[in-house]
Amino acid sequence: QMDHQLIDETGNRFRFSTDGKPGNFVDIVCTPDILQGLPGCGTVHHVAFATKNEQTQKIAQQKLIRFGLNVTPILDREYFHSIYFREPGGILFEIATLPPGFAIDEPLEELGMSLKLPSWEEKNRMAIESALPIINLRLENYKDHGHTNL
């Protein structure tokens, strides 16, 4: 349960929350009789959870180890630190720290305006950029909705 509390159960759907706030819950739908998907489109690659810092991450890591799960060491992903483990059904879970955050290599007001990659992906920049769709963002559509830094 990763410190989540069961707050609702309807049929085969179970809703877990850490604090009851909107967006801070996970729904799990149990369908053990369906066929298992193959890796690719339409399947889950991994599920990521955020944690406050490396200290809370280490606590989660130790709990998972006590549950008998195989958990990775803490991995530095430059923008955050991650641990990974597979749940009994085979889905890869990630627990990532919020710090250091995505503003470590660009000013906050420019966040998201250009593609930033972790150092180990720079060698793949051309291939990554060529596979991305062109996004035509009309910034004027967002200024009236409280987005003042656009």
Model region roles, listed by residue range:
Residues G101-P118:
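A short, polar/charged loop-to-alpha-helix boundary motif
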Residues V71-H81:
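Conserved blade-ending motifs and adjacent loop-strand segments that build the rim/top face
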Residues W120-L150:
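Cysteine/selenocysteine-centered motifs that mediate thiol-based redox chemistry or coordinate metal-sulfur cofactors
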Residues G20-L38, I59, I91-A96:
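Intrinsic, low-complexity N-terminal interaction/targeting segments
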Residues H81-I104:
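C-terminal hydrophobic structural anchor segments
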Residues M2-T10, T56-Q62, E106:
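Extended intrinsically disordered, low-complexity coil regions enriched in Ser, Thr, Gly, Ala
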Residues Q1-F25, D76:
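Core segments of cupin and vicinal oxygen chelate
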Residues G37-K63, H81-R86:
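Vicinal oxygen chelate
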